[in-house]
Regions:
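Gly/Pro-rich active-site loop or hairpin
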Residues: 131-133, 170-171
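N-terminal structural segment of carbohydrate-active enzymes
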Residues: 21, 30, 172, 176-181
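Boundary/entry segment of secreted carbohydrate-active catalytic domains
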Residues: 1-9
């Protein structure tokens, strides 16, 4: 499971559930919103201390660029700066080098992929969004998704933003908790 944007409720609501079920997730952090309250867009974010605690307990903390910009709309030099600046602060704050990358707005092309893939084990190029969209947020639809993965022998990467608030939040967070209990 992947969780985008470093929302405060990822620490307060989600992290305890992951611990309860023994799950590890990937948390895509864009450093500017953690460093600068004006970049938070009205959505409370985790602190660096909370991010470090999660990292120390085995959650993957990785890069979502410095400022969450659409990388297709900036120069390749700016892409490089977005990646390097965020990687540097994530390393400084967690003591771990980010090993994966998530594209803001899923905006990627072959030139961007070359830059973001350097020194990484992977980048998120495919995902299954779950959250606010009713068609993908019911217990039945989540069960069906997992069943299709098991039957086909494929991997699945769940992309989650808000839990109870914010972008694509669940209509009821219990849907996610119930899903975790089944998986």
């Amino acid at each position: 499971y992947t969780f985008d944007d470093g929302l405060q409720e990822h620490y307060t609501l989600l992290f305890p559930k992951l611990e309860k079920y023994g799950f590890k997730g990937t948390f895509w952090i864009w450093g500017k919103c953690i460093e600068n309250e004006s970049a938070m867009q009205g959505k409370p974010r985790m602190s660096w201390a909370q991010i470090k605690e999660m990292s120390d307990k085995g959650q993957e903390i990785s890069s979502h660029s410095w400022s969450h910009t659409n990388l297709k709309r900036v120069s390749l030099e700016e892409v490089k700066m977005e990646v390097e600046k965020n990687d540097s602060i994530l390393y400084e704050k967690t003591g771990k080098i980010p090993r994966t990358f998530c594209y803001p707005f899923n905006a990627v092309n072959s030139d961007i992929l070359k830059i973001t893939s350097k020194n990484r084990v992977g980048t998120r190029t495919e995902q299954y969004p779950i959250g606010g969209d009713k068609s993908k947020s019911t217990p039945e639809s989540l069960d069906k998704w997992v069943e299709s993965l098991v039957n086909s022998g494929r991997w699945g990467v769940a992309m989650i933003h808000g839990i109870s608030q914010g972008y694509d939040a669940f209509l009821n967070p219990e849907i996610l908790w119930e899903h975790f209990s089944k998986v």
